[in-house]
Curated annotation (Swiss-Prot):
This is Putative pre-16S rRNA nuclease. It holds the Pfam family RuvX. GO terms for cellular component: cytosol. PANTHER family: POLYNUCLEOTIDYL TRANSFERASE, RIBONUCLEASE H-LIKE SUPERFAMILY PROTEIN. InterPro entries: RNaseH-like_sf (IPR012337), YqgF (IPR005227), YqgF/RNaseH-like_dom (IPR006641), YqgF/RNaseH-like_dom_sf (IPR037027). Signal peptide: none annotated. It comes from Burkholderia lata (strain ATCC 17760 / DSM 23089 / LMG 22485 / NCIMB 9086 / R18194 / 383). Belongs to the YqgF nuclease family. Its EC number is 3.1.-.-.
Amino acid sequence: MSGASARDATLLAFDYGEKRIGVAVGNALTRSARALVVIQNLNREHRFKAVGDLLAEWRPDALVVGLPMHPDGTPHDMTQQAKRFGNQLNGRFGLPVTWVDERYSSVEAEAGLRERNVRGRARAEMLDAEAARVILQQYLDQLSDHEHH
């Protein structure tokens, strides 16, 4: 993506996990992202039906997938699964996928929810979507950094 389309794009971001997939929505023009929903990762059919429903509702121009890494930057057990998920999204829905290093997204998400006094079960349920928001915000911030006008 380049030019005007990248700047006014609607984006969906995913924090892929074996049990849950956090989803966030954002806009490249306003550089804003918000936690959207958590998909229960029950099986492939359920996962892609839920994603398909979100894509139909939000009609994003591109997708962002968090890539889990160890703190030193080496691949993690989940790195390959997240990559496979992103490749499947691209193949199934034909939208461009960008991977974002998500090393500290869950830590940031937890801190953000704590700051807003979200507690207990509500915090546990929102954590994955909030992690997706952090991933998407990182991506949007990188877009800003690359646009030196």
